[in-house]
């Protein structure tokens, strides 16, 4: 039964690992390589300590219906979701415009992203997770195709020359590991719920891979190389094969960003939608994206406010994670009192 449980949930775990590891660890590793350089390889492993503590305190068997009755949880979830999606759509649209279509207004890419993600938000979570797995498969096929092109062995080609560091920072803030807890809020919709053991394994993989990426990058150049960069080109596994280099690392980063946007924006919206009565869910999604649109355009026109959005995202993410952990324990006790068979 235990093996069957993990086999049936394999697509969920693959999506969790990919969107929290292969993407977040790239940006996370870049920060610590630039700021800590010499000792940066050990920091992701040390980060596992607070993550493990939070997971061990968390009760994965809680009933999400209990959380949905907590007004503070619903408010924080809504605020966090809106800020998260605003930043993610803004970042992906900026990267599309900066990297490839400089003459096309960024607002066009933002509007297209909003329309597509709004449409995807009407899917149920299992269909969305399977779509995310298809996007991952597409990326796996995309990388070998790029490596068919040969370029000179030149490290300068790998730098993020035009993409502002604040935009890259937005990637990290929108891929932090509170998602691991948010996945469990969909437990009633999975065939088998996500277990605490699975969360521990996934978080370990995320941070171990981040450490390995840093160690491998230091075999390519000296750590002082990264101290001089605004945003170091990091993932050698993607950008380097023997004597060949992938010239435009931003193409791969853009693909990661866009696939993450088309998955995570609906993921966040569906989670908020599920806290409401079914007869209000369709209207809510339309109002949600109607309200989201001016926020994205505001950020496009007022670039300096990105820092404020990232600070608010960090605060709401932290508070939301703490509330989920606290009320998961109360929720379990509450449910066991009402229905001892669960």
Predicted features along the sequence, with ranges:
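Membrane-water interface regions at transmembrane-helix termini and the short interhelical loops
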Residues: 34, 62-63, 91-97, 113-134, ...
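Membrane-interface capping segments at transmembrane-helix boundaries
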Residues: 3-4, 59-64, 325-339
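Extracellular/periplasmic helix-loop-helix junctions in multi-pass membrane proteins
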Residues: 280-285, 294-315
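Membrane-interface interhelical connector segments
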Residues: 219-248
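Membrane-interface loop-to-helix entry segments
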Residues: 87, 107, 120-150, 309-321
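Hydrophobic, membrane-embedded alpha-helices of multi-pass small-molecule transporters
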Residues: 7-27, 43-54, 77-81, 85, ...
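Membrane helical hairpin/interfacial module
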Residues: 22-107, 112-116, 292, 317-320
